[in-house]
């Protein structure tokens, strides 16, 4: 169920032009600074804002416009004809209804079976809220209800426009978990400029600048590209895919297996062995040495190989490393890079000072 876009649109002086294809599963994050065109693109996909060009989802044509002034063969499906569920920064709920009333209204319009309504209520954990009016809900509760409503009617695509931007940190994690769960059964196009949300959710990423998708690909690949937009950021971060290993009770350390290596994290004893996880490693938290140190307090020191190097500022060098078949970044001084005589193919050791689950 891929989404193929070849569209353009204008709002005032702002021009958007996008040619891209959404993968048929998982979460694709539209990432970029405010004003890059992320929300505008999402609204065009939904049919809320006009655009020219072609939008095709799976075998269904949602939008097609030609150059002819007569436009006899144009296709432009209305919002309600597109099999989508939507969430926005502010939940668009009916404030004169209870939570149950909001769900019932959408279920009737989308002809959702009773069993599906019950399933969505259970999935989003909103059963205790059903009798409450939505104007008495907290921000986190309102967004959980909005997500439940978006899931009704079995949408084939979820469009989420910065759904967590108005929430405090205490409410975000639960909703991130719910969105990740929903993405197991329906593809998601997710707008954000928040790096934590990108790291937590993205399978694929579209990087937007000035109304264009300037790069797209698997999130791990785009994060670790030396010439990529994300690697140039001060908070440049890489992702490693691993799985939960053993827990050392006397040291309160949790092992995470990455290939044939193990990284150690404090605590986390409640994780399930074998469970797939993601690790985030900031480039500034990786230092390099040519031989294995024997007297370091750093727990995670792993063999790696230099893939490439790039100057990223006065006296700063970004090093791309291959570690257990995946790539991470190290930000070191240019002087250190020269003293170590680093070049592609150099075998060395990466000292990872901090690593965290996402």
UniProtKB/Swiss-Prot annotation:
Part of the ABC transporter complex ModABC involved in molybdenum import. Responsible for energy coupling to the transport system. Its EC number is 7.3.2.5. Residues 2-235 form the ABC transporter domain. It catalyses: molybdate(out) + ATP + H2O = molybdate(in) + ADP + phosphate + H(+). One of its GO terms (cellular component) is plasma membrane. InterPro entries: AAA+_ATPase, ABC_transporter-like_ATP-bd, ABC_transporter-like_CS, Mo/tungstate-bd_C_term_dom, ModC_ABC_ATP-bd, Molybdenum_import_ModC, Mop_domain, P-loop_NTPase. The complex is composed of two ATP-binding proteins (ModC), two transmembrane proteins (ModB) and a solute-binding protein (ModA). The lineage of its organism: Bacteria, Pseudomonadati, Pseudomonadota, Gammaproteobacteria, Oceanospirillales. This is Molybdenum import ATP-binding protein ModC. Keywords: ATP-binding, Cell inner membrane, Cell membrane, Membrane, Molybdenum, Nucleotide-binding, Translocase, Transport. It is an enzyme of class 7 (translocase). It is found in: Cell inner membrane. It holds the Pfam family ABC_tran. It is a peripheral membrane protein. Belongs to the ABC transporter superfamily. Molybdate importer (TC 3.A.1.8) family. One of its GO terms (molecular function) is ATP binding. ATP binds at residues 32-39. Residues 295-358 form the Mop domain.
